[in-house]
């Protein structure tokens, strides 16, 4: 019994003597879970030998022995074409050797990942059938493999699959589940094994489904193939499936990889399905019964032929003799021969050992470089004389002779498969020994697999004849050409630089550096665009003008976008459209003189009709008066409305001419010509406009506050002077009744308000004192006020004078009809007042007084009061007892308290008195 299993109760049969086994320790064909696999011979039959070594100090010794014992026990009881055959075990020096049949094709995983091997669908079904047959055989014998995967499936001749590596196999009852050790490989393990639940033989079915996924997709399994339930992600799996995959295989994968163990088919059912598919030829295979060749594992030849060894020894001896002769020129020939013989003997032994290890055949196992340190005095390092399949290794620099020996460094004799390395400069001999270093001679000999370097483009130049055929020269020749083309003054410097340029093909590549200075104009279009520079532009323009060449930067298409330069750039032309809104500009003060003469006449007929006509105003220009025109900027708030303007024309009054003051409202418009004057110059001031509005049947049958009434007295012969000035009046709300004074000579009509005064404009007309009185009744004073506009949305405040002006459209612009309506009202007033005076009061005897009494006196005399309301307008009129000519005021608002030009002061404490009393019967 084996010493390893001497404590085991199981009988270890089939024990083979180690001396019966013949194998080379270098003939490794693979590795398993517990050791390496070698190719050997047992009784003239090729076998596979699995070497397992377990040291006494290994902490997992007991576990490893347990699984090893289980594998041996399982293999010796199994015999199936799809299960690897067991021959016995052997032991030597605490190592155990498992003897099995030799499967030279390798594992299935190597064929799956190597996509250059064409595996048809029919062959894949055959592979799946063999795996299912082995699995059904194991399950029938109560064995669970628990580590079924593609690396544990070997490919024998004729593509027969054999299951191996039974180290984790476990014999158990077929009908019961048990909680066993979590073992296996994660990518192939069933969900119940991963989470530590009880499992049975169905775990091998899940692993079989994962092997089918490898066969179909021919890709390595990754955790991405599993979903959150530890099953198979069908969506991801189907994305990797080829288009020509048989549906039967996809259905089989879906059934085998179910999460629930009870839903998976048994191994025997899987085997029957696959055999049915192969027999019925359900899979159409274009390749027929093609089977790709298998992977071969021929053991390597361990030694070189004798003639090749002798040639190597002779070369080494000659090299050593030459080196020794150079080192010992002062010694005798006998000493040289003795030294040569001794050195040759040592070198022969060392070289033979080195050559046997360094020069491999085509199937040697790759291994790293191992320097030979046995010969210290004389190192013949032939490590770089590699075979075609030697392991690639880094560059080993020439080792210096520490003890004064001879150093033959042939490190630069590179093989075609040597490790790529950068340029290594020659090493110096540390102790002054002779160093036959061949680096300088071999530096320029590039191997095909030398250190990679970037691509060096060739330079294209023109030949000396100026032809367009380019000459392709190397980088070195171009650089030398540039260096030789320098100036005479720089010849010494260029030669010195040229002497320093010792290029080697082993040197690290450097970018091309040309000594030629390329002008900017030659590469202008390819250079980076730059901003405009005025100084360089001028210099370039001057230079180009001299050379009759056009500057490249002159064209803005190739220059960098730059700011506009008014000196050199052309004028910018662009079209723009704008909606022009006329904004009145504040007018400056100008001077003008206007002398106006107005003739005012009044006449009365027998039925006491008063005739009022418009006043003709012939004007003349002098040099002594000024006109001030102001426009409020706030009037621009409403477009289309004319600005307020006030024109004030003071004049010099002749002694024989009385002064008449007329205030013209600024917002009175009767035509478009007067809405916005064309000119505000001295020669064309806006003319006052007379607007009288009247209606027939509603409450608007009144004179608007913007109206100007001019009465013409027929008896007046002397002209009057017009003075235009802004006045402040109050906006009437409630009208007060003023006393009425009636005489045979004059009639004065006045209206005032009792509310808070506001700004407004007024017009006052004063007649000449020299005007002779008429026997008819003369209208001395007329004041007409209107109530505030009831439509608040249509009213607007005049910013210049503060007037509250109504902008209602004039109902009639016919002056004749409007004048007739006013005259009719005055006739009714006059007739009514005359009747009341005759009935109640006596005529006043003081009618010849020349001075008009104040308004307060009128209020105290009830005998002189009268009132009449029409069209929501209250008119208070009075008859003056004096017959002297009085002034006529026509205000546009109700109050004259703030008007300095008013002839009648406002009453301080007005008292309401009514003259009307019913006549007593």
From Swiss-Prot:
Which CDD domains does this UniProt record tie to the protein? STKc_MAP3K-like
Q: Where along this sequence does the record place binding of ATP?
A: 29-37, 50
Question: GO molecular function: any one?
Answer: protein serine kinase activity
- Say yes or no: keyword Kinase present: yes
SUPFAM superfamilies, alphabetized: Protein kinase-like (PK-like)
Give the CC-aspect GO terms: cytoplasm
Quick one: where's region Disordered? Answer: 289-453, 465-492, 530-571, 583-653, 671-698, 737-813, 833-858, 877-921
Q: What PROSITE patterns does UniProt report for this protein, alphabetically?
A: PROTEIN_KINASE_DOM, PROTEIN_KINASE_ST
Task: Using the UniProt record, name the top-level EC class of this enzyme in a single word.
Answer: transferase
A Pfam family this chain is assigned to? Pkinase
The EC number(s) attached to this protein equal 2.7.11.1
Instruction: From the UniProt record, list the coiled-coil ranges.
Output: none
Q: Protein kinase domain spans which residues?
A: 23-277
> What are the entry keywords?
ATP-binding, Kinase, Nucleotide-binding, Serine/threonine-protein kinase, Transferase
> Of which family is this protein a member?
Belongs to the protein kinase superfamily. TKL Ser/Thr protein kinase family.
Which protein is depicted? Probable serine/threonine-protein kinase DDB_G0275165
Q: Which organism is this protein's natural source?
A: Dictyostelium discoideum
């Amino acid at each position: 019994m084996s010493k390893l299993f001497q404590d085991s109760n199981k009988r270890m049969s089939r024990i083979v003597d180690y001396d019966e086994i013949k194998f080379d320790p270098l003939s490794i064909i693979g590795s398993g879970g517990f050791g390496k696999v070698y190719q050997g011979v047992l009784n003239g039959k090729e076998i596979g030998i699995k070497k397992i070594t377990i040291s006494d100090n290994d902490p997992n010794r007991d576990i490893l022995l347990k699984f090893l014992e289980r594998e041996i026990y399982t293999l010796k009881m199994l015999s199936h074409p799809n299960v690897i055959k067991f021959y016995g075990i052997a032991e030597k020096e605490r190592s155990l050797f498992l003897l099995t049949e030799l499967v030279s094709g390798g594992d299935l995983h190597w064929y799956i990942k190597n996509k250059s091997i064409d595996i048809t669908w029919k062959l894949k079904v055959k592979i799946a059938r063999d795996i299912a047959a082995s699995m059904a055989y194991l399950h029938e014998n109560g064995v669970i493999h628990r580590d079924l995967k593609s690396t544990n499936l070997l490919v024998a001749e004729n593509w027969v699959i054999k299951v191996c590596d039974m180290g984790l196999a476990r014999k158990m009852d077929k009908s019961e589940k048990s909680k066993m050790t979590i073992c296996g490989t994660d990518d192939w393990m069933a969900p119940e094994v991963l989470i530590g639940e009880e499992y049975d033989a169905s775990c091998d079915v899940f692993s079989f489904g994962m092997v089918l996924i490898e066969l179909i997709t021919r890709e390595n399994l990754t955790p991405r193939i599993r979903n959150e339930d530890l099953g198979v992600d069908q969506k991801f799996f189907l994305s990797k499936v080829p288009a020509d995959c048989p549906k039967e295989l996809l259905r089989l994968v879906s059934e085998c990889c179910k999460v629930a163990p009870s839903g998976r088919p048994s191994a025997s059912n899987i085997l029957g399905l696959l055999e049915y598919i192969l027999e019925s030829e359900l899979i159409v295979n274009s390749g027929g019964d093609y089977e790709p060749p298998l992977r071969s594992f021929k053991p390597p030849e361990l030694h070189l032929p004798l003639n090749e060894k002798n040639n190597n020894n002779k070369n080494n001896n000659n090299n050593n003799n030459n080196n020794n002769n150079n080192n010992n020129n002062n010694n005798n020939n006998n000493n040289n021969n003795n030294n040569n013989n001794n050195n040759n003997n040592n070198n022969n032994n060392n070289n033979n050992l080195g050559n046997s290890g360094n020069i491999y055949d085509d199937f040697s196992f790759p291994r790293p470089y191992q320097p030979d340190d046995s010969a210290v005095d004389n190192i013949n390092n032939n490590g770089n004389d590699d075979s075609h399949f030697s392991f690639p290794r880094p560059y080993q620099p020439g080792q210096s002779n520490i003890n004064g020996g001879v150093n033959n460094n042939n490190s630069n004799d590179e093989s075609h498969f040597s490790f790529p390395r950068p340029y290594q400069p020659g090493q110096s001999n540390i102790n002054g020994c002779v160093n036959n270093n061949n680096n300088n001679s071999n530096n320029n000999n590039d191997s095909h697999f030398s250190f990679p370097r970037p691509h060096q483009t060739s330079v294209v130049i023109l030949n000396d004849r100026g032809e367009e055929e380019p000459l392709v020269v190397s980088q070195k020749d171009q650089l030398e050409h540039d260096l030789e083309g320098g100036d005479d003054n720089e010849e010494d410097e260029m030669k010195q630089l040229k002497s320093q340029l010792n290029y080697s093909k082993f040197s690290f590549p450097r970018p091309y550096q040309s000594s030629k200075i390329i002008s900017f104009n030659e590469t202008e279009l390819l250079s980076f665009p730059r901003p405009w520079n005025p100084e360089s532009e001028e210099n370039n323009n001057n230079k180009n003008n001299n050379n009759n060449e056009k500057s490249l930067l002159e064209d803005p298409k190739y220059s960098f976008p730059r700011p506009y330069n008014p000196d050199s750039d052309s004028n910018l032309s662009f079209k723009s459209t704008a909606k022009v809104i006329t904004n009145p500009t504040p007018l400056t003060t100008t001077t003008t003189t206007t002398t106006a003469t107005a003739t005012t006449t009044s006449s009365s007929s027998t039925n006491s009709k008063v005739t009022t006509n418009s006043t003709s105003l012939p004007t003349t220009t002098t040099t002594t008066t000024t006109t001030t025109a102001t426009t409020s900027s706030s009037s621009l708030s409403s477009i289309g409305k004319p600005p307020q303007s006030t024109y004030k024309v003071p004049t010099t009054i002749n002694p024989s001419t009385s002064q008449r003051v007329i205030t013209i409202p600024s917002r009175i418009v009767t035509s478009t010509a007067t809405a916005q004057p064309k000119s505000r110059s001295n020669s064309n001031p806006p003319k006052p406009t007379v607007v009288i509005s009247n209606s027939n049947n509603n409450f608007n049958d009144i004179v608007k506050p913007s109206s100007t009434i001019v009465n013409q007295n027929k008896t007046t012969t002397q002209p009057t002077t017009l003075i235009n000035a802004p006045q402040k009046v109050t906006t009437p709300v409630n009208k007060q009744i003023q006393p009425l004074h009636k005489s045979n000579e004059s009639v004065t009509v006045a209206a005032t308000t009792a509310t808070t005064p506001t700004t407004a404009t007024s017009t006052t007309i004063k007649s000449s004192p020299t005007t002779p009185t008429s026997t008819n009744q003369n209208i001395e004073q007329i004041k007409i006020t209107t109530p505030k506009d009831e439509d608040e949305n249509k009213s607007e405040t005049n910013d210049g004078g503060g007037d509250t002006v109504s902008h209602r459209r004039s109902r009639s612009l016919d002056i004749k009809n409007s004048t007739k309506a006013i005259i009719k009202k005055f006739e009714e007033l006059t007739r009514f007042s005359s009747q009341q005076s005759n009935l109640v009061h006596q005529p006043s005897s003081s009618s010849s007084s020349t001075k008009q009494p104040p308004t307060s006196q009128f209020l105290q005399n009830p005998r002189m009061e009268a009132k009449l309301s029409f069209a929501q307008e209250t008119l208070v009129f009075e008859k003056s007892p004096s017959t002297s000519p009085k002034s006529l005021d026509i205000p546009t608002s109700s109050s004259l308290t703030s008007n300095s030009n008013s002839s009648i002061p406002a009453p301080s404490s007005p008292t309401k008195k009514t003259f009307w009393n019913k006549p007593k019967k």
